[in-house]
Amino acid sequence: MEHENLETLIATLGTLDHHGVDWPRVQWTAYLIHQHLRYDYPGPIHDLHQRLMIVPPERHGGQRLVTRKLEIAIPGQPPEQVPTPQESRDEFGNLVLSFSATEIARSIDFVAWIVVERDTASDPAIISAHTFFNPAFSEPSALTQPDDALRAAAAALAVGDAAPEALAARINAWVHAQLTYEHGITGVRTTAAEALALQRGVCQDYAHIMLAICRLCGLPARYVSGHLLGEGGSHAWVEVLAPRPNGDGYVALPFDPTHGNRPGLNYITVATGR
């Protein structure tokens, strides 16, 4: 979905200091996401293949994609000669932009402009029965394999007959209390068990621990990647998949164990996965 006059739309949005916003009273907001990704290489690169997952879904609960634009610049190449990315969907329905180039001399720039709207009137993101029963969201992944400590935590947290949302909230609060946020301690291959043992980590570690415990407690759950206003870079949180209270279908309920809260209007979902 490309907007013919993105510049005009951007000009109407305006800016504000999010620290001064009384978020509980906000019912609707629009966001401009500007991302500039630059890749530098020590020398010429041949047969480059790049995959980008930066475009939010068309709809996700109260979030709606309004418009998007991607510019690609390769020094030394006229814009009309830069290849156009191919669009596809991965197994979870996320939009993937695939870019290929025969040769890159030194660098390549990807610049994205994305506008999304969010409101509080909409229900949580509705999911299909196929998604709810997908084993990918109920069984451990490589990064969420449980150990004895995670199993013990799940057993303690699952005491009682809590509804899925209440149990998820209990797990969310517990994970938040167990870790201290700290950069440089963990990496992209750090497992939930390792992060819990360290009791330190970043948002992806909080999310992996919550995913592991939710699945041990019988709650299907998935990883969410997106943006949190004021964080600067990307952020990760969790969606717990549950039947709707009226029994009509299924929804994805968001939780952010890093901050110990429920994501609101200041969160933007980009992609979901295991």
Regions found by a protein language model. Give the residues of each.
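Residue-level preference for alpha-helix termini and adjacent loops
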Residues: 40, 44, 51-53, 98, ...
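Hydrophobic/aromatic-rich core segments of domains that either
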Residues: 173, 205-274
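Short capping/connector residues at structural and topological boundaries
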Residues: 46, 50, 142, 186, ...
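Short alpha-helix boundary/capping motifs
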Residues: 37, 65, 199, 203, ...
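Linear, non-domain "peripheral" regions
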Residues: 1-152, 218-219
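Generic structural "secondary-structure junction" signal
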Residues: 43, 47, 54, 72, ...
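Secondary-structure boundary elements
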Residues: 116-120, 124-201, 209
